[in-house]
Amino acid sequence: LNFSRSEIEALLRESFARGDQPLLHVSGDATLAAVLDAMQAVGSPDAWRALRPRIEHGEGLAADQVARARAFGIVLVQNPAHFMLPPTETAYMQAHALQPLADVLKGGIALALGSDGPPNPWLNMMFAIAPVSRPDQALSREQVLRAYTSGSAYAEFSEHEKGKLAPGYFADLAVLSQDVLDVALPAQALPATASLLTVVGGEIAWRDPAF
């Protein structure tokens, strides 16, 4: 913990009073427990749900914390590259049932995925569908794509304008060099995926010269 529990509570109380969405950089199981305790001291779960509090990373989320996190409307914003941990950390994650990503979705917690570093989203898709630290918590390719798109839009209160291709939504899209949802495509081949055409706001931002 970089902050004391009283400091965490004070920061959350200030955010709660303003009606601001809190974004908390959380790693480790003890840290998340402290955040949830502070949230409980500040306001009711119903009031917190309206703010969609974001937990960035949150790899310390334990299976027995899922129901509590859902009650407060936690949005988990995870970076699959963090699943590639040194063996000592991987053993700890497995022993303490941390990083229950599949269970997070089953438990009704909103999930958004981002790349952090390295920035390649398809490398991160590979990590998410075949996580070394918790292979039992692998996501499907469709779940990963949904978390990257509509999940990320929900995390920033913009789910009615982006996150999917639909009338009235931003015309942001990409034509890819291969079908990332095809299970016949090996997971190891995903990082080589490239954009042949990228459209942002209806305008072409990138086109492969050969496309």
Give the residues covered by each predicted segment.
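Active-site gating/metal-coordination segments in enzymes
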Residues: L1-A10, G58
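Residues that cap or delimit alpha-helices
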Residues: S4, A184-A189
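Structural alpha-helical segments in enzyme catalytic/regulatory domains
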Residues: A71-G73
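Residue-level structural signal for beta-strand termini and adjacent loop
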Residues: A210-F211
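His/Asp/Glu-enriched, well-ordered alpha-helical/loop segment
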Residues: R13-L24, A30-P53, H57-G58, A63-A67, ...
